[in-house]
Amino acid sequence: MTTVLIAPLRRAGVLAKQAATIDALSGGRLTLGLGVGAREDDFQFAPASFHDRGRRFEEQLDLMKRVWSGQPVSDEIGPVGPPPAQAGGPELLIGGYTPVSIQRVGRWGDGFISWGVRDPEQVRRLFDLAEESWRTEGREGKPRLVASLYYALGPNADRGGDYIRHYYSYFGPGADDMARSIPSTQEALDNLIRGLGDVGADEVICWPTVAELDQVDLLAELVG
């Protein structure tokens, strides 16, 4: 699972072929999380246009769906392989935290993935928007709902805040708020994971913010 890959930084045709190849090699186990991105410096470096990234993302989704379903790409270009193992392409999760980004779930996605969870009630509102977009497009069933969170456990848990402040420095004071809110005890992390389950998360992805392997062991002790 990619959580999430910033599609507007990339060429849609190449990305579609790469994803289809990985899906075929893995026997259909690829879940592709995609979003538009929020860091303008990423786009300056690429380089790629930043302010029209939402429109370009939707054009990319249209193209990738055509490629994966075996349709001609254009009047001049026929179907392009390799075919993915999953019919219609890999499972596609749309990431984001604004209503506009979440509205794309119903039209193009198989589900929604939230980002950097701190408050289950906030995630509930995002999940509700994803389900609303699903119904608006007249789709059956429900979207897959995935939550992701940061955590730091053990004697060096305070380093987790340093990582968040550095990575999200472009948020300004918001980076400090994020750093202070990451769970740093097993009780706090357990409460957050349970809270996300209560608001409808089908899966919770936990990202350690301390670069030590024992973070995985400490998480395993908690979740069993």
Regions found by a protein language model. Give the residues of each.
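Active-site-adjacent structural elements that line small-molecule/cofactor binding pockets in enzymes
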Residues: M1-G224
